[in-house]
């Protein structure tokens, strides 16, 4: 049985200078997504996607590495300045922002958009270890 020819799409270089870096920092992982101003994703990375497993995913170093890889691929599209939105209480919040700056992106604004309930759902019971 012959295999069909699969046409691979080449990633088109977009010329976008301003963008938004969404950092989702949970207690277990850190996900960094870099989008344009309209929310279309340019690049993304996470601690788990880089090969960190288990409790190593929730370290500030893993968040730093995820942020660096996402920013490098976004800078290939011509990204220069970025607004940062941070969501979640995890340990990788600050280190992910610092990694964006050290990678060469200019951070213009930092916004905390962590969802806070106005006494909505009942939280899960406390862990007893």
From Swiss-Prot:
The keyword rRNA-binding applies. GO terms for molecular function: rRNA binding; structural constituent of ribosome. GO terms for biological process: translation. Pfam families: Ribosomal_S11. The keyword Metal-binding does not apply. InterPro entries: Ribosomal_uS11, Ribosomal_uS11_bac-type, Ribosomal_uS11_CS, Ribosomal_uS11_sf. Keywords: Ribonucleoprotein, Ribosomal protein, RNA-binding, rRNA-binding. One of its GO terms (cellular component) is ribonucleoprotein complex. Part of the 30S ribosomal subunit. Interacts with proteins S7 and S18. Binds to IF-3. NCBIfam families: PRK05309.1, uS11_bact. Belongs to the universal ribosomal protein uS11 family. Located on the platform of the 30S subunit, it bridges several disparate RNA helices of the 16S rRNA. Forms part of the Shine-Dalgarno cleft in the 70S ribosome. PANTHER family: 40S RIBOSOMAL PROTEIN S14/30S RIBOSOMAL PROTEIN S11 (PTHR11759). HAMAP family: Ribosomal_uS11. This is Small ribosomal subunit protein uS11. It comes from Staphylococcus epidermidis (strain ATCC 35984 / DSM 28319 / BCRC 17069 / CCUG 31568 / BM 3577 / RP62A). The gene is rpsK.
């Amino acid at each position: 049985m012959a295999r069909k020819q699969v046409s691979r799409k080449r990633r088109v270089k977009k010329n976008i200078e301003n963008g938004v870096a969404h950092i989702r920092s949970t207690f277990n992982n850190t996900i960094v997504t870099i989008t344009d101003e309209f929310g279309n994703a340019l690049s993304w990375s996470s601690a788990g996607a880089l090969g960190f497993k288990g409790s190593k995913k929730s370290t500030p170093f893993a968040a730093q590495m995820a942020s660096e890889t996402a920013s490098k691929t976004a800078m290939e599209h011509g990204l220069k300045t970025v607004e940062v939105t941070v969501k979640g209480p995890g340990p990788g919040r600050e280190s992910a922002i610092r990694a964006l700056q050290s990678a060469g992106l200019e951070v213009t604004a930092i916004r905390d958009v962590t969802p806070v309930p106005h006494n909505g759902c009942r939280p899960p019971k406390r862990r007893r270890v």
